[in-house]
Amino acid sequence: MFQREFEFTLPKGYLDSDGNIHRKGVMRLATAIDEISPLRDPRVKSNPAYATIIILARVITRLGALSELSPMVVENFFAQDVSYLQDFYRRINGLENETTVPEDTTNSSEPLVHT
């Protein structure tokens, strides 16, 4: 049986409304629907980078003591944590060795998955 869930620790952590920091979490492997579903979301249609937020909210199954992880929670992650999670997502899903895009055409607002 192969591993489907992976533990991580955020560099900064999510600060909730009560002042609690949540750093330890679990991310599951992404499925095709995790990457396709956000494309139908109006927020992604107006801002393609928002797909990253939706995808992360779908694949993070646990973060600290939070009972639920929605895109609204992911929106409030520190930039360093989002960058860490994007790298972690690519690594566990075997996407880190994809064809590289020339440096002059890269855009930091691109979603996790190139369609």
Predicted feature residues:
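Short, surface-exposed, charged amphipathic helix/loop patches that serve as local interaction elements
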Residues: M1-T115
